[in-house]
Amino acid sequence: MRDYLKYCAYKIQYKQKGYLDLSREKFMYPTTLLPLLILVSEITPNKTIMPENRDLANYIQVARGQHLTDDTKTYIPLTKLPKQQRDASFVVEKIRRLAEDTEIAVENLNELIYIVEELIANIYEHSEFKEAYMFAQRYKNRGVMDLCFVDDGITIPRSFEKIGIIYNRDLHAEAIYNALHGLSSKREPGRGTGLKSVGRLVREGFEGEILIVSGFGAVYAAAKGEPLFITLLEETEFKGTLASIRVPLKKAVKSLYDFL
């Protein structure tokens, strides 16, 4: 949650001052970097003070110009999802290759790919997005991977509105929590299990962390402790949905079927 709130602070800075000052930044996690890259790409170049750190500055410049770099062994750069779900398999393969470089156990890899496929499917089936992006980072020394997806779709609360379930802005976090526990905007039997099983697999299987931000709500959940609910300020409303996970790659994971 802290990493997303860091992005919120920069968004408020831009709204209040009319520019972004990133000069002191040396490193950012995907939950900060992905939405920030999108914000930077939307504003004029002279409204951003770039980081003094050359590596981070170069990366932001690349993303702003929409010229995507080749994948490295430690991260997948800002990647735009295609309009059609059938064309999105390359995203899954990028993440598979990144995870395989950690000597991840086959069982863990299967569970990780399930999570990725479900998060991608959720974007296509529910969000009605115009643009969606992914960013991934692997931390070899820590043995963990961060994955972050964002879309500019109708948000989780608005998706529920379409079937008559209304959440006012103070309850957007509750809508997200309910989605993570099986409530679906699709009326067909058996729907709603995807995001629920993803949440359980991340927290209970990998003993990792998951953050979902949508509209005025944000929910963070980890293996230990109670979920954290936040209602966002007017200035930090997320016009779409952000899904971010952190998973340990080498920890033994229970069977996927324990979480379906």
Question: At which residue positions do the language-model features occur?
Answer:
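Conserved short strand/loop->alpha-helix "switch" segment adjacent to the catalytic nucleotide/phosphoryl-transfer site
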Residues: 27, 93-117
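N-terminal assembly/transducer modules of large multi-domain enzymes
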Residues: 1-65, 239, 244-260
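Acidic ATP/Mg2+-coordinating residue in the GHKL
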Residues: 151
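A short glycine-centered beta->alpha linker in the GHKL/HATPase_c
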Residues: 155-168
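Flexible, glycine-/charge-rich segments associated with ATP-binding catalytic modules
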Residues: 1-16, 166-168, 181-260
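Short beta-strand element(s) in the Bergerat
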Residues: 143-147, 241
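Conserved ATP-binding N-box helix of the HATPase_c
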Residues: 37-39, 106-141, 196-199
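Short adenine-binding "F-helix/F-box" segment of the Bergerat
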Residues: 161-162, 172-180
